[in-house]
Amino acid sequence: MKKFGKYSLIICGLLLFTAGTKAQQINNFTVQQAVDYAKKNSVHVKNALLDVLIQKQVNRDITSIALPQINGSAGVTYNIDIPVQTIPNFISPATYKVLIDEGVKNGNGQTITYPAGGFGNLLFPFGTPWVASAGVTLSQIVFDGQVFIALKARNGTISLQERIAELTEENIKANVYKVYYQLVVGKTQIELLDANLNRLEKLKHDVQIIYDNGFVEKIDIDKLSVQIANLQTEKLKANNMIKNGYSGLKLLMGMPIKDSLVLADKLDENQVKEGMLEASQFKYSDRKDFQISTVTNVLNGLNLRRYKLSQIPTFALVGGYSKQAQRTEFNFFNKGDWFTSSYIGLQMRVPIFNGFALQAKKQQARLQLQKTQNQTEALKISIDGEVENSKNNFIAAIATMDFQKKNMALAEKVYDQTKKKYEIGTGSATEINTAQLDLKTAQTNYISALYDAIIAKVDFLKATGKL
């Protein structure tokens, strides 16, 4: 029994370990895989795609207006008090006339005459206590200008929601690119910090030997220790920023925070330089926001036309068929008469006067169309500015990146030469500290220029609609 309990604990532990391992998924993603993952899992993209599906159902609702409308009805009524109709007494006068003409006498032996108070009224109950009915009605729009325009606008509304969804995907893609490569640049920064630490550790080791031989002071070693501590602190901060960056990227992609994310892409400067498109290759229609503006203009034009067509008469076919039974008792399932009624007709509705409401709506639609047209023209100007600025920034960023790369290589060369001079006793501690500081500054500038070039490329591709 004790053995069984021991093995049970082991088995449970293994199961829990297996479950925990499955719960944490490891994702080794290139930037394109990260973008694809975000398109499938980002809440913003999901909701944008749901808006497309919602619009499709709205269009189905609009389409149903143009289809036959068939409604059925059935019911049973019990008349507690049957309605009574009062009519003048037309029976008694005729009876009295016959009696008077024949000279008939009453029981007292007197000749019958017309009563002095008249004959009064007759009371007739119309209906029966129990009434049952069942029927169906049909209506079909033959022509309605507003419905016609609504049907015509269906493709436009779907296109609008699809363009909005694509714009959402594009924004997510741009942000994923920026954060992804920011983390890649961060990894490069860590590599440079490690290289600097190795240099300083080696330099400190060499200076320690020189110090042991009595050629340098203890302060030279202390200065190197301070620099090493500063670099270690900087590396710690950089690693913390990278960890937070991974969390931000997962959040942007819609990935569970507990999952592991590994960046598979390396930083390739030649890849950054690719895509420097000429301005002549740019088209407004490549931009998702311009496509949205274009579709909006079309829909606003249809909206204006809808109000214009609402002044035209509408036509509809109507029809109905019903059965009714009347009983003194609830016995509708027994044999008895059911009376049929049916009709068919054509209805016309003519708008005559609505208090100038239609004129106001038409003017609103016309002004709204003018407004969106103005916004489209303003968007063109804005796009031109974005393309020009992003192109200039991209070119400048590439040039800066190349310059800083050369400058970093030169600073590294200067440091190596200064270190050799210091080791053979022809250089000073100040010179090597300055060279180390210059190298670190050059590396920092290169990292910054590299990231700026990536951001500039993403902004340029987005501005030209090529992202």
Predicted regions located by residue number:
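Small/polar, glycine/serine/threonine/aspartate-rich low-complexity segments that form flexible
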Residues: 25-26, 73-136, 266-274, 318-350
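Bacterial Sec-pathway N-terminal export signals of envelope proteins
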Residues: 23-84, 257, 263-301, 352
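Short segments within alpha-helical structural elements
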Residues: 233-255, 409-466
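Acidic, low-complexity, intrinsically disordered peripheral segments
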Residues: 3-6, 24, 71-73, 80-89, ...
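Sec/SRP-type N-terminal targeting helices
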Residues: 46-50, 63, 126, 142-169, ...
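Bacterial N-terminal signal peptides
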Residues: 8-18
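Periplasmic alpha-helical coiled-coil/stalk elements that build and connect Gram-negative outer-membrane
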Residues: 2-3, 57-59, 163-165, 169-284, ...
